[in-house]
């Protein structure tokens, strides 16, 4: 019996953590599953992000529970990792689950 490989926040060593790109890459690399962090926005959307504060990952000050989803979706959650990930948006929990389910 082999151990299960669970990708922490997706393939976060190669792509911005908790993004659709990171979760897809984890699957491509053979991870058996992943873990993610979920926050709730002011207008009750479930989004996937580790930190409540947006500062570190976007360079824009904000607190996810105090923000509306549409405002969060305008922020870039990828360029902090590398310019190649610029434009990466915060995913909803539903998007992450659908992406994982339909990717194989």
Regions found by a protein language model. Give the residues of each.
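Phosphate-group recognition and catalysis centered on beta-loop-alpha active-site segments
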Residues: 1-104
């Amino acid at each position: 019996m082999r151990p299960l490989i669970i990708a922490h926040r997706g393939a976060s060593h190669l792509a911005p953590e908790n993004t659709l790109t990171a979760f897809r890459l984890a699957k491509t690399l053979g991870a058996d599953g992943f873990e993610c962090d979920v926050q709730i926005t002011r207008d009750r959307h479930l989004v996937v992000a580790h930190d409540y504060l947006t500062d570190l990952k976007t360079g824009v000050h904000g607190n996810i529970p105090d923000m509306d989803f549409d405002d969060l979706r305008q922020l870039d959650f990828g360029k902090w990792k590398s310019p190649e990930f610029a434009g990466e948006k915060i995913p909803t929990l539903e998007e992450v689950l659908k992406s994982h389910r339909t990717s194989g």
